Amino acid sequence: RSLNMSETEIRDLKTAGLLHDIGKIGIDKQLFNKNGNLSDSEWSDIRRHPDIGYQILRSVDEFAPIAEYVLHHHERIDGKGYPRGIKGDKTPLQSKIINIVNAYDKMTRYRSYKDKLSKSEAIEELKRNSGTQFDQGLVEVFIKRVLGE
C-alpha cells in the first residue's frame, strides 16, 4: 500500500510472488541443491527458469497478466540480471519487488550451498546491493514497512 498500488495490482503481485519460480519445474532439481559451484552449463540451465515460467503462465488466461512479472524477477537495476539484462525502469515494479523479497527469503533460509544470514545481516546485504541489484527506494520501503526496521 505504501507504493500506491491498486487492489488488482496487489492481488497480481501476490499471485506472481507465489508463482515466480514455477519455471523451475522445467529444470533438473538436482541443480538447485548441488553442493559446490555450478558449471557454466548448469548455471545457464538455472537461468532459463524465468523464461519457462513466463511460457507456462502466459499460456493460462488467468495468469497471463502476471507472466511478465515472473519473466523479469531476476533482472537487476544495473542491467546485469537475467534473462534479458534489462535496466532500471524497464523492469516492471512487481518484478523488482519479487526480486527483493525472493533475495531476502533466500538469504535468511538454510541452503545446502550457503549458510543463512541473520535478519540484520540480510538487511545489510540488501542495502549493500541497493542501486545495483535492487531498486533503492523499494529496498527502503521493504526494510521499513515489511521488516519493521
Question: Where are the language model's segments positioned?
Answer:
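Metal-dependent catalytic cores of enzymes that make or break cyclic nucleotides
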Residues: 1-149
